[in-house]
Amino acid sequence: MGGELRLEDALGGVERPYLVSPQRLYTRDDLMQGWHPGADHSATLDGRIYAHVKAHGGRAPDMMEGLAQRTHDHFIDSALAGFLMESARPVIGIMGGSGTLASDPNYRRVVELAASLTQRGYLVVGGGALGIMEAANLGAYLAARSDRERDDAVQALADTPGYASDQAGYLQVAVGVRERFAPGAESLAIPTWVSEGEPINQFAPHIAKYFSNSIREDGLLAVATAGIVFAPGGAGTMQEIFQDAAQNAYKVFGRSPMVFLDRQHYCADTGLYPALQRQAERLGFADLLSVADEPADILKRFPVRPSGLDATDTPRRVLMRMRNLR
């Protein structure tokens, strides 16, 4: 406590809604503090922190606020490295659009995929917000449940108007789904306070939330050392695809599979997969690329975790080397 107070004083003595030196990752309950049925995202600690960020310059904070945010993110890095060490599981990322509704077939496919990967011993990590990111954490959360129960959970979310049109209503349904199927299995979320009003989803027990989106994105891709699945998304997903491709090309953190969900989207509608495949052939990592329409086909790239596989240290060492942590 004394160290926290001294650090706060050194950063201007300003009262902030977040701890400058968090000693662990956030939980869903931490960031939902203040919420009650009928309330929207602004009532939560998560929403209050975003409002604070917006009021203090957003992406261009003043010096003391910027120092406080960067210090916070450093401590989150350390907490994340510790969590990855304790998890002792290989990490697979699932990326995709935040606007994908639960009624979209790809949302249900990602739920099924994340559940299967969790059953196989992987730790699923996503961006922590809604859409495909929510589907990834939801699927992991429901890994021990039946297909029927997963269908019921997805249908409950699909029957709501959607977060964009009814924040309070959507949150209430999502909280209800979480409570109905508690306790859920573990997964990880790595979100950011950059995107306006974007809430955490309700299904990730461990949350490494950052102020800096560039630090967050780099870490999110780097820790997924067992591979990344890319569902359809927009510009943010496209950025993640090419950033991950660059990491594979330069062997920044070794090389890992890049698997694309939805052949029509990636091969025909956007042409992203053929373009990336040509570059991957030139740069020597084409064997890591694949595209599929169904979870069963994607799972062929990610076998059941071999007995005794020590995946504890790889994501942690990658993060620590990248951040120069000790």
Label every model-predicted segment.
Residues 131-230:
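Acidic/glycine-enriched connector segments
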Residues 1-172:
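Glycine-rich beta-alpha loop segments
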Residues 5-8, 102, 197, 265-271:
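Short, charged/polar "capping" segments at the starts of alpha-helices
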Residues 121, 148-159, 231-232, 238, ...:
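Short, acidic/small-residue loops that bind anionic groups at enzyme active sites
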Residues 220-222, 255-326:
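C-terminal functional extensions of proteins
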Residues 93-97, 127, 189-192, 231-232, ...:
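Short beta-strand segments
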Residues 136-139, 200, 240-243, 270-273:
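Short acidic, glycine/serine/threonine-rich loops at helix termini
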Residues 103-105, 238-242:
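Glycine/threonine-rich flexible loop motifs
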